[in-house]
Swiss-Prot record:
A GO term for molecular function: DNA-binding transcription factor activity
Cell compartment(s), UniProt: Cytoplasm, Nucleoid
Coiled-coil residue windows: 71-93
Domain HTH tetR-type intervals: 7-68
Species classification: Bacteria, Pseudomonadati, Pseudomonadota, Gammaproteobacteria, Vibrionales
Source organism per UniProt: Aliivibrio fischeri (strain ATCC 700601 / ES114)
Protein name per its UniProtKB record: Nucleoid occlusion factor SlmA
Function: Required for nucleoid occlusion (NO) phenomenon, which prevents Z-ring formation and cell division over the nucleoid. Acts as a DNA-associated cell division inhibitor that binds simultaneously chromosomal DNA and FtsZ, and disrupts the assembly of FtsZ polymers. SlmA-DNA-binding sequences (SBS) are dispersed on non-Ter regions of the chromosome, preventing FtsZ polymerization at these regions.
InterPro entries from the UniProt entry: Homeodomain-like_sf, HTH-type_TetR-like_transc_reg, HTH_TetR, NO_SlmA, SlmA-like_C, Tet_transcr_reg_TetR-rel_C_sf
GO CC, any one term: cytoplasm
């Protein structure tokens, strides 16, 4: 008979932190004392799993990065049409934010305002990777389909990332009322008409 698997305390801590970021507490600085109370452990117990609060945030950032880029790779493997790839990548990013409001606070930098600069730098690197991915998809169009975009691919990629970041910021600013994927089909029709 298999014994029930004991929940991983490290994952519990990260889950609790993400939930706190999603709640009204996420609008303020989250202390380790509040987090320990939420998890139901002492602060010392938190530090047995993570040497610092920054490491807890790093754990969530690693989850964000792994979740997004593993799916990006799947999109690139499964889909070859440039515009479809862009559409799916945009939808992926917006849906990820919608499903993970607490993590979206991290991605906008809102939750990292009073934290270590290194954390904000990690988020910046994620967005730079996303922009690079858009740029690569756009540049490959010339090779795959034999036609270029009327505007430089770097400018288009920056515009696409700006749209995503704007949607994330609006979502956080509205206390998660304005869903990033709301009206996506109309949003995509407008955007795709501009970049063709």
């Amino acid at each position: 008979m298999a014994t029930p698997r004991k929940p991983n305390r490290r994952d519990e801590i990260l889950q609790a932190l993400a939930e706190m970021l999603e709640s009204n507490e996420g609008a303020a600085r989250i202390t380790t004392a509040k987090l320990a109370k939420q998890v139901g452990v002492s602060e010392a117990a938190l530090y047995r799993h993570f040497p610092s609060k920054a490491k807890m945030f790093e754990g969530l950032i690693e989850f964000i990065e792994e979740s997004i880029f593993s799916r990006v790779n799947r999109i690139l493997e499964d889909e070859k049409d440039t515009l479809k790839r862009i559409e799916l990548l945009l939808k992926l990013l917006l849906a990820f934010a919608e499903r993970n409001p607490g993590l979206t606070r991290i991605m906008t930098g809102h939750a990292l305002m009073f934290e270590n600069e290194r954390l904000r730098s990690r988020i910046n690197q994620i967005f730079e990777r996303i922009e690079l991915q858009f740029k690569q998809i756009l540049r490959e169009r010339k090779l795959r389909e034999g036609k270029a975009f009327p505007i430089d691919e770097s400018i288009l990629a920056a515009q696409l990332v700006g749209q995503v970041e704007g949607s994330f910021c609006r979502f956080v600013r509205s206390d998660f009322k304005y869903q990033p994927t709301e009206n996506f089909n109309e949003y995509w029709a407008l955007l795709s008409a501009q970049i063709q």
